[in-house]
Amino acid sequence: MQFLYKIPGYILLLFGGFCLSWGGFVIRSFEEASVWQILLLRSSFFMIALIIFLIITYKKNTIRVLKDAGFAGLLGGFVMSLSFIAFVVAMTNTSVANVVFIISTQTMFLAIFGYFYLKEKVSLVSFISILLAMSGITIMVGDSLTSGSFFGNLVALAIPINFSILVMIIRKNKNLDMVPAIFYSGIFSVIYGLILSESFVFTS
């Protein structure tokens, strides 16, 4: 699995976006399932895939890597798990297009958080992009007041915000392997689903 680290970032980003675009279709296919049931099912399969990835990648060092991530890994996992919840809730309360657009504003929040937290300068291009993104969100949220999807759009905003916070945590802990944070996010999400699901019967 070490070959993944050699793949250009933009290719991984495009592939991630492609996979994410199917999220709405999968979530909407469970018409009778509650938000927490969907979260539990989604997180369970996520955990299975991730455990396989970790074992193949780190082999006998898997447990050590998970421990070495420490509090930063747990905090990053908790923050990411909140994004998982927001994604499922948003997808069931507003359009897929709205959710995907709002998620795409993550770069805006990264620039803002980076400026205040990491003291990174914001270029003119980034500043203009932030203004355009904010304008788009304002128009979208304003329209949703009459369409009844305001709550879904508002929850969707938590996704790019939490992911940006996660990036800040990762940047602040460059000396740590933060892949375990993804593992912990799956654990948190499964726990949420187990506690809050009324039943474990799924209807597609």
Where are these regions (language model features)?
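Hydrophobic transmembrane alpha-helices of multi-pass small-molecule transport proteins
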Residues: 50, 54, 80, 122-142, ...
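Helix-loop interface residues and adjacent transmembrane-helix termini in multi-pass membrane transporters
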Residues: 32-33, 93, 119-121, 175-176
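Specific alpha-helical transmembrane segments that line the substrate/conduction pathway
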Residues: 37-48, 88-119, 159
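Specific transmembrane alpha-helical segments of multi-pass solute transporters/efflux pumps
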Residues: 20, 58-97, 103, 111, ...
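Glycine-/small-residue-enriched transmembrane alpha-helix faces in small-molecule transporters
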Residues: 1-39, 78, 145-172, 191-192
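Loop-to-transmembrane alpha-helix entry segments
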Residues: 67, 100-103, 119-139, 146-153
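Hydrophobic alpha-helical transmembrane segments of multi-pass integral membrane proteins
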Residues: 7-12, 37-56, 71, 129-132, ...
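Membrane-interface helix termini and inter-helical loops of multi-pass transporters
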Residues: 25-35, 61-63, 92, 98, ...
